[in-house]
From Swiss-Prot:
One of its GO terms (cellular component) is cytoplasm. This is RNA pyrophosphohydrolase. Its EC number is 3.6.1.-. Its cofactor is a divalent metal cation. Accelerates the degradation of transcripts by removing pyrophosphate from the 5'-end of triphosphorylated RNA, leading to a more labile monophosphorylated state that can stimulate subsequent ribonuclease cleavage. NCBIfam families: PRK00714.1-2, PRK00714.1-4, PRK00714.1-5. The gene is rppH. Keywords: Hydrolase. PROSITE patterns: NUDIX, NUDIX_BOX. It comes from the Bacteria. GO terms for biological process: mRNA catabolic process. HAMAP family: Nudix_RppH. GO terms for molecular function: mRNA 5'-diphosphatase activity. Belongs to the Nudix hydrolase family. RppH subfamily.
Length: 176
């Protein structure tokens, strides 16, 4: 399901533990790491899609997490042409995402990367809140910057968490 501009509706999940470290998943049979994410099915709300993806990719149920916040609007990224299947190149541009910030209220042992018949990750770890900016694949970096910065205002209520010096200029949220 694509919108008129060629973007697939999607949800992204930033899952934090009690130390405000983020869940970081290693894509199966690859050397890349990312946050859980996935498409919104027809008739599904972003929140319903988020809970479905959370279970499919991480094995967590609604009782294992608390929703702390979500982005105000859609954040978009374009997928490089050479990554797009030939038959989709004239219609598909990338993803548009609503991002959710979740707190793990369960235990680390509740995480199960094999909850689905098609696992996305084969390893995971907790990382510093800003580490994903250094490690995510380049074409997703701006969306990660926008989501992390916007949701840091919710997570670190006393004042927004400062990104590392190298990312301060990059972390400004740009309105679409």
């Amino acid at each position: 399901m694509l919108d008129r501009e060629g973007y697939r509706p999607n949800v992204g999940i930033i899952l934090v533990n009690t130390r405000n470290e983020v869940f970081w998943g290693k894509r199966i049979r690859e050397h890349s790491w990312q946050f859980p994410q996935g498409g919104i099915k027809h008739g599904e709300s972003p929140e319903q899609a988020m809970f479905r993806e959370l279970f499919e990719e991480v094995g967590l149920r609604p009782e294992h997490v608390k929703i702390l916040g979500r982005t105000r609007g859609w954040l978009r990224y374009d997928v490089p042409k050479h990554w797009i299947k030939r038959e989709w190149r004239n219609t598909y541009r990338g993803q548009k995402q609503i991002w959710f910030l979740l707190r793990l209220v369960g235990r680390d042992s509740d995480v199960c990367l094999r909850a689905s018949t098609h696992p996305e990750f084969d390893a995971w770890r907790w990382s510093d809140y800003w580490v994903p900016l250094e490690a995510v694949i380049e074409f997703k970096r701006q969306v990660y910057q926008q989501a992390l910065f916007e949701l840091s205002k919710t997570l670190f209520r006393t004042r927004p968490c400062d990104p590392p010096e190298a990312y301060k200029a990059l972390a400004e949220v740009r309105e679409p």
